[in-house]
Amino acid sequence: MKKICLILLVSAFTTPLFSQQLAVINFLSPRFETPNFLWIGTTYDFGKIKVNRPVTHEFRFTNSGDAPLVISSVQASCGCTVTDYSRDPIGPGSEGYVKATYNAAKAGVFSKTITVNANAAESVVQLTIKGEVVE
């Protein structure tokens, strides 16, 4: 009699467990919204330029991600390069820019970098301007 009561008691508690559905969570491919840079070019060659004549190039990009892209800072490698950039959030599919103006004080070959920090998948991007300054 004890065995029958024990079997009935165990089956009374385990039957509801088998009737519940399990929640399946996919941990392998989480979906996060992220902004992403799609640059038209990351290097620009000015060629030959004159001393003390500023030259400017505008690097353009598209936010190919699915969240707003925000540039937090843009820094040039030296004081001879002044930068400007899109300061408002760039929505998915929209375009933005980083502008670099270089003013050479002496003749010679140059190569300068502009570092872009943003909330994109590639959070730090290096842009390069180069050329040759002639008298």
Regions found by a protein language model. Give the residues of each.
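Short, hydrophobic/aromatic beta-strand segments
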Residues: 67-74, 126-128
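Sec-dependent N-terminal signal peptides
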Residues: 4-13
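Asparagine-centered strand-capping/turn motif at beta-strand->loop junctions
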Residues: 61-65
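Short, solvent-exposed loop/turn segments enriched in Ser/Thr/Gly
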Residues: 52-58, 105-113
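Beta-sheet-dominated interaction scaffolds and their linkers
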Residues: 24-60, 135
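Terminal connector regions
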Residues: 108-135
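Positively charged n-region of N-terminal signal peptides that target proteins for export
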Residues: 1-4, 20
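Short, solvent-exposed loop/linker segments at beta-strand-coil boundaries, enriched for Pro/Gly
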Residues: 77-84
